[in-house]
Curated annotation (Swiss-Prot):
Belongs to the RRM MRD1 family. The gene is MRD1. This is Multiple RNA-binding domain-containing protein 1. Residues 121-143, 203-276, 297-336, 864-887 are annotated as: Disordered. One of its GO terms (biological process) is maturation of SSU-rRNA. Residues 306-315 have a biased composition (Polar residues).
Length: 887
């Protein structure tokens, strides 16, 4: 937490006045820093809260870059006065803190949300009840439709042809025809029955007086009959009475009348059938003959059923359309944000400090998971931050966790606002597009795409062999054909010596420009590389500094461009990382002249001093060219020149050697944020300073990182110098902590400085990665130019072929060290030589026997362990202390 809240401010106080008041303490605390205004830079945000009218609410917030300054401000200013107002200072809380009271606006918003949810539930319950009533109503209507056969027939007929198959249509037509025939028969029978009932009624009226004792079978015993009966019911009763009357009681005339009516109906049907078969009859006449009168009650029933069927279909369609909308629940903004982050794995950061670096956000977000990219948006014209950044995780789940934990949290004194970021645009070709290209083009594009993730950790100062020979030939005034003789067996050695000479010149030039070459050998991971520094390699000899500048300038402003006079390698530093990344991506493996450019990111903090005026590419200084030598020397002059360089470097080296043990000073109560560089800057001004080191330990939470242990050591040449430093620096303040100094009992330097241990090194070195084609003569000629050799041995196999390494022993250890320094990074027959110090030969026979015994025990133990692993079973193996040392 690096943000504080200040209460009880005067009404008239402004933001600038509040900043100035709290800056005084920072200037007093960081008084040892020489840069004026470093205190104000540590305050990142000042804000006094005001109401709608612009009146001060008498409290405000102040943000600090680090937590130590924020806690110090709370302790120093709490209970103090600004003019006549007593202020109260405490640590501010973030929005995610549960102790923060909920504002009234948020309470009203939540109450409204609960009211809407309750209203929605009531509406859903009402719709459910209404739907249930409609379903019951529809089920009753369906039952009525199933009972009415004529309505079913009508609905089947009115179905569209797309819903009825051909065989179903034939069956329906046949059933319709059968139904029509059946209906005609029923109509004819009903008509005959009505005539019969009419005749019987006449007969009954005529025979009331004549036959009073007429017996009617199965007569009803009801004493009363309904008065208001319908006409249809009378016909039904008449039909029932017709069945009850005995046929034997009818007269012959009546029976004949009935038979005549039946015959007439049959004739009418026969006439209709003949009319249908007559070809001369028109379709209209036939249709008129087939018409059947429908009662008004039946017509109304059919209309209602058809209208209901149409409404039912429309309601079903409407339900299908409305159902998906009701099924999808409304998601909150938080859920939508998490869903988008799960898809992209990218976060958008707002309200960040304008001076924040990418390393700050890497430290903040790396605990949540592995980061793929951190990008701070910069203005290409000014190089300043725009106030927002992007963080891309390899796993989207880690991005969600970071969003939940860090959103609206305090970072560098500001409230960090995190939003889901859009997916990063990629212009990469897919596999389908690559397949349509030539194979050579495919390999080129794939290599270019992998350039940003590829690192060259094997040789940072790699140089093109052709450019090396061209540089040496131009320096000696020779042609490359004259420098290297194809028929000479020592051509490979001459080429290696030429490369060593060029590498020596390049190192001298870079060291004069403030480049720390030791950083290049310490590169072990991508985290130790600086995106703004690019090493340019493999360009042909003759390339000028202006040509390289024209290549890199379109991508952004250059801070410096260093190119040695040899013209075989260059270092480019951009002002911002965005421009450097764009240049690295676009120019990797680009064809330039008759070669392909290799790019590599340089190490962090490789420059020990700021850029000079002549390092800027904007200064179009004249090209520095050396005059060629009029007399062409022989190729042996190269060895002589190399010897001169070796002697000069050895003399300079002798001046840096420290004779005798150094004296260490133990420093206690260091700030955990104090680094080796900070400690070095404070003590390097004293005479006799050697090295300063802060003791660290591995960070258990973050793999590959270290934590300060709160103490350190500073080494000086003599004890008198160390005592003088203790008297001057004991009790002073470094990074806000009062340090304590005293002499340490550790006398020998353990800083890893190779120069202080040069006397303990042997004159025997082992040369690894030696080409199998190299002979003992090649190794002898290569190392003979750096000193007097005592022995050269190239071990071989049983078939007389080389084993890939050699032993070279110099007469003096100093000569061996010079040879290792000069041949560092040199190639022999295309292989980079790797050199290390070898163990010296045993002084007496007993020591040699002990070494051989230890070696044999190690081999035996290794073989037994291998047999145990491959045997599949567990065996008991006794290993004593001496054997354990060999593992």
């Amino acid at each position: 937490m690096s943000r504080i809240i200040v209460k009880g401010l005067p009404v008239y106080l402004t933001d600038d006045n509040l900043r100035e008041h709290f800056t005084k303490r920072l200037r007093q605390k960081h008084s040892h820093q020489a840069v004026n205004g470093s205190g104000p830079d540590l305050i990142t945000d000042v804000k006094i809260l005001r109401d709608r009218n612009g009146e001060s609410r008498r409290f405000g917030f102040i943000g600090y870059r680090n937590e130590e300054d924020a806690f110090d401000a709370v302790e120093y200013f709490n209970g103090s006065f600004i003019n006549t107002s007593k202020i109260e200072v405490s640590m501010a809380k973030s929005f995610a803190d549960p102790r923060v009271p909920q504002p009234m606006k948020e309470k009203r918003r939540e109450a409204l949300k609960r009211f809407r949810e309750k209203e929605e539930k009531l509406l859903q319950e009402e719709n459910r009840k209404k739907k249930k009533v409609d379903e019951n109503k529809h089920s009753n209507i369906d039952d009525e439709i199933r009972k009415n056969k004529q309505l079913q027939e009508f609905m089947e007929t009115m179905k569209p042809s797309s819903q009825v198959t051909s065989w179903e249509k034939v069956g329906i037509d046949k059933s319709i025809e059968d139904e029509k025939l059946k209906r005609e028969e029923e109509d004819s029978s009903v008509q005959g029955n009505s005539l019969l009932a009419h005749a019987l009624a006449l007969k009954e009226e005529n025979n009331k007086d004549e036959a009073p004792n007429l017996v009617i079978e199965n007569e009803s015993d009801d004493e009363y009959s309904a008065l208001n009966r319908n006409r249809d019911e009378d016909q039904e009763d008449a039909g029932e009475e017709e069945k009850m009357i005995s046929i034997s009681n009818l007269k012959d005339t009546d029976i004949g009348l009935v038979n005549d009516d039946a015959n007439s109906d049959e004739k009418e049907n026969e006439k209709r059938r003949n009319l249908a078969q007559d070809e001369k009859v028109s379709d209209l006449d036939w249709f008129k003959q087939r018409r059947v009168r429908i009662k008004e009650s039946e017509a109304e029933t059919r209309e209602k059923s058809s209208s209901y069927a149409t409404e039912q279909n429309e309601s079903l369609d409407t339900k299908k359309e409305e159902q998906p909308e009701r099924a999808v629940p409304q998601k909150t903004d938080e859920e939508l944000a998490i869903e988008k982050i799960n898809q992209t794995g990218r976060l958008f950061l707002r309200n960040i400090l304008y001076t924040s670096k990418e390393e700050d956000f890497r430290k903040l977000f790396s605990p949540f998971g592995e980061l793929e990219e951190v990008h701070v948006a910069l203005d290409t014209r000014t190089g300043q931050s725009k106030g927002f950044a992007y963080v891309l995780f390899k796993d989207s789940k880690n991005a969600v966790n970071a969003y939940v934990e860090l959103d609206k949290q305090i970072f560098q004194g500001r409230l960090l606002h995190i939003l889901p970021g859009e997916e990063k645009k990629s212009h990469r070709l897919d596999e389908f597009d690559l397949k349509n290209m030539p194979l050579k083009k495919q390999k080129e594009l794939k290599r270019k795409a992998a350039a940003s993730r590829q690192t060259f950790s094997w040789n940072s100062l790699y140089m093109n062999q052709d450019a090396v020979l061209g540089s040496v030939a131009a320096k000696l005034g020779l042609e490359k054909s004259q420098l290297i003789d194809a028929e000479n067996s020592s051509s490979a050695v001459k080429q290696a010596l030429a490369e060593a000479h060029v590498i020596g010149d390049v190192r001298k030039y870079f060291e004069s420009k403030g480049v720390d070459l030791t950083k290049f050998s310490q590169l072990k991971s991508t985290n130790q590389r600086d995106d703004k520094v690019i090493l340019v390699k493999n360009f042909p000899f003759g390339t000028t500094r202006e040509e390289l500048g024209e290549m890199f300038l379109p991508y952004g402003k250059l801070e410096r461009l260093l190119m040695p006079p040899a013209g075989t390698i260059a270092i480019v530093q951009f002002r911002d990382t965005t421009s450097a990344r764009a240049a690295f991506t676009k120019l990797s493996y680009k064809r330039f002249k008759d070669g392909i450019i290799y790019l590599e990111r340089g190490p962090k903090d490789c420059f020990t001093k700021p850029a000079e005026a002549d390092d800027l590419i904007n200064n179009t200084s004249a090209k520095e060219e050396e005059n060629p030598v009029e007399v062409k020397p022989s190729s042996n002059d190269l060895m002589e020149a190399n010897k001169d360089v070796t002697e000069g470097s050895s003399n300079a080296h002798d001046e840096d050697v420290i004779d005798g043990p150094t004296v260490s000073i133990f420093i206690k109560n260091l700030n955990f944020s104090t680094t080796n560089q900070n400690l070095t800057d404070r003590f390097k001004v004293f005479t006799g300073f050697v090295v300063a080191q802060v003791k660290t330990k591995p960070d258990p939470k973050h793999q590959g990182k270290t934590l300060s242990m709160g103490f350190g050591f500073v080494e000086f040449r003599t004890k008198e110098q160390a005592n003088a430093v203790i008297a001057a620096m004991d009790g002073t303040v470094i990074d806000g902590h009062k340090i304590q100094l005293k002499l340490s009992h550790r006398q020998a330097s353990q800083s890893g400085n190779t120069k202080t241990k040069s006397n303990k090194k042997s004159g025997k070195i082992i040369v690894k990665n030696l080409p199998f084609e190299a002979t003992r003569k090649d190794v002898f000629e290569l190392f003979n130019s750096f000193g007097q050799l005592k022995s050269v041995r190239v071990p071989k196999k049983f078939d007389k072929s080389a084993r890939g390494f050699a032993f070279v022993e110099f007469l003096l250890p100093k000569e061996a060290e010079n040879a290792m320094d000069q041949l560092h990074g040199v190639h022999l027959l295309g292989r980079r030589l790797v050199m290390q110090y070898a163990e010296e030969d045993a002084v007496d026979a007993e020591e040699e026997i002990a070494r051989m015994t230890k070696k044999v025990r190690k081999q035996v133990a290794t073989n037994e362990m291998a047999a145990l692993r491959n045997g599949g079973g567990r065996k008991k193996l006794d290993v004593d202390d001496e054997e354990n040392e060999g593992f």
